[in-house]
């Protein structure tokens, strides 16, 4: 079964994502598996819930593309960033054929919950750190193509119509 992603310029991608309540219900557990399948099917290394139509603060990641079991990040928060950063081009599964030049920290420390609700604090480097920052942007309604010469452009972001709602899904729109 082919999994369709929400694609730019759909304004749903500009939505802020909502906190995921614990314990996870069956629907959310199925959504995590669905997100993983979608990420692998589209040959990505990360995928946020908003990209499959859910305004939830979670994403999956597998920078090694092992296709075994991706890491699951629920209610993530970056709590520490390195001073060092690097600017590079990024693509996005929700914006095929488009790329943005994005400045990212090379090391971040992330606080998040796993599928059991356990709080985890872990430091990530290089590609994993870049991927996490990219997916975190999705949770805030930002896309890599919103960056101008490596820096986030508020004007470019504001030019998109923002969607306000509580915990809605793409199918509710």
Give the residues covered by each predicted segment:
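Positively charged
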Residues: 1-173
């Amino acid at each position: 079964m082919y999994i369709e992603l929400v694609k730019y310029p759909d304004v749903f991608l500009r939505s802020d994502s909502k906190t995921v309540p614990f314990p996870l219900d069956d629907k959310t557990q199925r959504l995590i598996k669905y997100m993983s399948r979608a990420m692998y099917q589209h040959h990505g290394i990360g995928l946020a819930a908003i990209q499959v139509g859910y305004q939830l603060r979670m994403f999956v990641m597998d920078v090694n593309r092992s296709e075994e079991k991706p890491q699951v990040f629920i209610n993530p928060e970056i709590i520490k960033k390195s001073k060092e950063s690097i600017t590079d081009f990024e693509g996005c599964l929700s914006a095929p054929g488009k790329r943005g030049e994005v400045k990212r920290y090379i090391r971040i420390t992330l606080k998040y919950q796993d599928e059991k609700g356990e709080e985890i604090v872990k430091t990530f480097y290089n590609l994993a750190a870049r991927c996490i920052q990219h997916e975190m942007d999705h949770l805030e309604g930002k896309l890599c193509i919103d960056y101008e010469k490596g820096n986030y452009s508020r004007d470019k972001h504001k030019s998109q119509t923002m969607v306000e709602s509580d915990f809605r899904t793409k199918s509710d729109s």
